[in-house]
Design a protein with these regions (language model features):
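Transmembrane helix-loop-helix hairpins at the membrane interface
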Residues: 63-195
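Membrane-water interface of transmembrane alpha-helices
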Residues: 24-37, 96-105
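Interfacial loop-to-helix junctions that mark the boundaries of transmembrane helices
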Residues: 8-18, 46-52, 148
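Membrane-water interface at loop-to-transmembrane-helix junctions
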Residues: 49-58, 116-121
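Alpha-helical transmembrane segments
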Residues: 1, 25-26, 56-63, 125-131
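Transmembrane alpha-helix boundary signature
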Residues: 2-3, 32-40, 66-71
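Flexible interhelical linker loops that connect adjacent transmembrane helices
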Residues: 37-49
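Alpha-helical transmembrane segments in multi-pass membrane proteins
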Residues: 1-33
């Protein structure tokens, strides 16, 4: 099923409209649900003390995942719209939803009993990573709503989601995860410029 394109989006090849809608719904949730705020979804410029070094290390590790796919032969050439889209939208839309909304809500339910390298986390991080991997690995839904998930298409997003989830817990903000997500999206296209 595809959302009909509204004026301004009709001639674009990338899913700008869908990503903007995805990025907007956490803000609707903030407006409608008591107890959910900009800070609780990680839309804050205040980071936990000591956040920078471990976050940079984690995000560099996350960049290794698409780098491995490039080494294994993945290539992707982009036009200007593709570059703009990958540098802005996927991380913004997906991190606000998965790390901004799902992970904190699941943390409320399950708590954060574990600690790793200065970040407290729990089942919220793990479940969110599974949901994220499933949404990225989901390649087909037929009219009877039978879904097909391609495992190899879900593994890299699962690993990236674990890292992004940890960064979200370590920093109390979605912004480093948004940045890392968008950066990881351009590793293969950037490396493809030189092949």
């Amino acid at each position: 099923m595809e959302i009909p394109r509204v004026d301004g989006f009709q001639h674009l090849h990338w899913s700008w409209q869908e990503c903007l809608l995805s990025a907007a719904w956490p803000f609707l949730l903030i407006a409608l649900v008591p107890g959910i705020s900009l800070v609780s979804v990680g839309v804050t410029s205040r980071f936990r003390p000591g956040w920078l070094k471990p976050s940079v290390v984690a995000l560099l590790l996350a960049l290794a995942v698409p780098a491995v796919f490039f080494i294994l032969g993945a290539r992707k050439k982009l036009d200007a719209e593709g570059w703009a889209f990958l540098l802005i939208m996927p991380g913004l839309a997906e991190e606000l939803v998965f790390r901004g909304v799902y992970q904190p809500l699941l943390n409320r339910v399950f708590g954060k009993p574990w600690r790793l390298a200065g970040a407290e986390f729990g089942w919220g991080l793990i479940i969110t990573a599974i949901l994220f991997a499933g949404s990225n690995g989901l390649v087909a839904v037929d009219p009877q709503l039978h879904a097909r998930i391609v495992l190899h298409a879900a593994i890299a997003p699962f690993l990236m989601s674990l890292v992004s989830g940890w960064v979200r817990e370590r920093t109390d903000s979605v912004w480093p995860s948004v940045f890392g997500h968008n950066l990881s999206n351009i590793v293969i296209p950037f490396a493809s410029l030189f092949t």
